[in-house]
């Protein structure tokens, strides 16, 4: 990278370091910022939130995470996501407007790709098509550096991951990410 990942300045408001001294190492690490969709908030809220974050992070590189795929986490702990394809594509459009001409790292939909293997064949094809369509929208509409999340090191065989990536990727996607929502060690993931 030509510049370091942004480390959030949480401490400037709440003085967390003094309140939680054992956690100070955590505050010194880059953190990602997760964006889903909150129907209770005005539609422009996410766009403004992303713009504010990108402006605060300059000149460093923030990491954003998109996390709103329909049937997110296939009904497990983080279930939810957009209710319909249309709602999801609206979310994608608002996300791209938030990024604008900036180039943050964006982790695309943690666990959505490996979870597709837990769906019926029809649901799997629907999800993969939605992922392909939304990635095309994203890479055509903004300068984000997109990485498709492929789960963790103990989930799918590399051959299966490669086959799934072939179905949804496009040349503008920068690569893939691992372990975005798990607790595997770096050593396990390499």
Please place each PLM-identified region on the residue numbering:
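Structural preference for beta-strand elements that scaffold enzyme active sites
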Residues: 32-33, 59-65, 103-107, 143-147, ...
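A non-catalytic structural micro-motif
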Residues: 134-145
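Structural recognition of alpha->loop->beta junctions
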Residues: 89-103, 163-176
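Distinct, well-ordered alpha-helical segments
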Residues: 119-120, 124-134, 156-169, 188-190
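Extracytoplasmic/secreted cell-surface and envelope-processing proteins
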Residues: 72-76, 114-118, 155-159, 184-188
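Mobile, glycine-rich extracellular loop/lid and propeptide segments
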Residues: 63-69, 84-89, 98, 104-115, ...
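Catalytic alpha/beta core domains of metabolic enzymes, predominantly
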Residues: 171-190
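N-terminal carbohydrate-binding/catalytic regions of secreted carbohydrate-active enzymes
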Residues: 2-98
């Amino acid at each position: 990278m030509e510049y370091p990942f942004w480390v959030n300045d949480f401490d400037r408001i709440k003085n967390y370091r003094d309140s939680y001294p054992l956690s100070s190492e955590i505050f010194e690490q880059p953190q990602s910022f997760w964006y889903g969709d909150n129907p209770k908030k005005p539609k422009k809220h996410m766009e403004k939130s992303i713009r504010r974050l990108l402006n605060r992070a300059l000149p460093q590189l923030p990491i954003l995470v998109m996390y709103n795929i329909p049937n997110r986490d296939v009904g497990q702990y983080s279930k939810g996501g957009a209710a319909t394809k249309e709602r999801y594509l609206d979310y994608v459009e608002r996300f791209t407007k938030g990024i604008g001409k900036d180039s943050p790292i964006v982790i695309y939909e943690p666990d959505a790709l490996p979870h597709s293997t837990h769906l019926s064949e029809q649901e799997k094809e629907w999800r993969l098509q939605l992922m392909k369509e939304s990635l095309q929208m994203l890479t055509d509409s903004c300068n984000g550096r997109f990485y498709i999340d492929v789960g963790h090191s103990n989930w799918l065989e590399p051959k299966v991951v490669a086959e799934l990536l072939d179905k949804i990727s496009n040349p503008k996607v920068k690569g893939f990410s691992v372990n975005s929502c798990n607790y595997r060690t770096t050593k396990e993931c390499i």
